[in-house]
């Protein structure tokens, strides 16, 4: 039974997901349905958490919009996601960057990874 489930999950997984880590700045383009119209909406911010669970993988992106912190959790292999683009590589030493929630201004900056 588990082989059938694994086979179905493998078929549903996206192959074009770029490699990114916590601390990286990414731009996620998401399909949004408004009434009968369908359009792309970009959400750009810093990846603060990644949850690796195969087909059920997810990542959290945080940005500051009009002085207010906004976080959004995306399912990595969701058909709603059109594309993920890595804008900047960040150098951090933790897997979960939840401490950025309390920080503002210069203390919330992340150094750029050179490699």
Curated annotation (Swiss-Prot):
Pfam families reported for this sequence: Ribosomal_L19 (PF01245)
MF GO annotations: structural constituent of ribosome
Keywords: Ribonucleoprotein, Ribosomal protein
GO CC aspect terms: cytosolic large ribosomal subunit
Highest taxon, organism lineage: Bacteria
Entry-linked HAMAP family: Ribosomal_bL19
Name by which UniProt lists this protein: Large ribosomal subunit protein bL19
Source species: Pectobacterium atrosepticum (strain SCRI 1043 / ATCC BAA-672)
């Amino acid at each position: 039974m588990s082989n059938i489930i694994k086979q179905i999950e493998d078929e549903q997984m996206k192959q074009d997901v770029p490699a990114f880590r916590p601390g990286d700045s990414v731009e996620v383009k998401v399909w949004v349905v408004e009434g009968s119209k369908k359009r792309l909406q970009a959400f750009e911010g810093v990846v603060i958490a990644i949850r690796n669970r195969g087909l059920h993988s997810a990542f959290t992106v945080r940005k500051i919009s009009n002085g207010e912190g906004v976080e959004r959790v995306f399912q990595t292999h969701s058909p709603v996601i059109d594309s993920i683009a890595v804008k900047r590589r960040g150098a951090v030493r933790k897997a979960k960057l939840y401490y950025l929630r309390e920080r503002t201004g210069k203390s919330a900056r992340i150094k750029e990874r050179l490699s």
